[in-house]
């Protein structure tokens, strides 16, 4: 993420592995919640999704830009069900969301999550492309 920076305090080292995966970053002067599911197994995916929802729910409605990276993530049935419910629960807080890293069978899960949540989350081939789209007015 070339022109992006993490918006966090120096206590980064004290963050849990889950909290390190869900952080606000800044891209071209705009705040984006980066939810990093990359290489997560099903258990970690659920924990990351829960942390993402916790942070989103602290923000005003329809205010948050989100970037979700699912590169190399693996899912089980329970994780998919949980992810569907979290994406739906996050909807009131998200102004715009994007996804990167969708490959192979992940496309089926991506379509199922969108259908269940009734949200359209465009997918991009790179984080940079997604960030550019998110911050455009």
Can you say where each PLM-predicted feature lies in the sequence?
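Amphipathic, Lys/Arg-enriched alpha-helical "gate/interface" segment within cytosolic domains
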Residues: 2-137
């Amino acid at each position: 993420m070339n022109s992006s920076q993490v918006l966090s305090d120096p206590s980064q080292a004290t963050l849990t592995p889950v909290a390190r995966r869900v952080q606000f970053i800044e891209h071209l002067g705009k705040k984006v919640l980066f939810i990093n599911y990359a290489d997560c197994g099903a258990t970690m995916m659920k924990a990351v999704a829960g942390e993402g929802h916790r942070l989103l729910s602290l923000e005003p409605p329809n205010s948050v830009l989100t970037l979700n990276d699912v590169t190399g993530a693996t899912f089980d049935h329970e994780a998919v069900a949980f992810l569907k419910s979290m994406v739906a629960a996050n909807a009131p807080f998200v102004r715009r969301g994007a996804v990167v890293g969708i490959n192979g069978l992940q496309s089926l899960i991506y379509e199922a999550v969108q259908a269940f949540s009734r949200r359209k989350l465009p997918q991009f081939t790179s984080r940079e492309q997604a960030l550019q789209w998110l911050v455009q007015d």
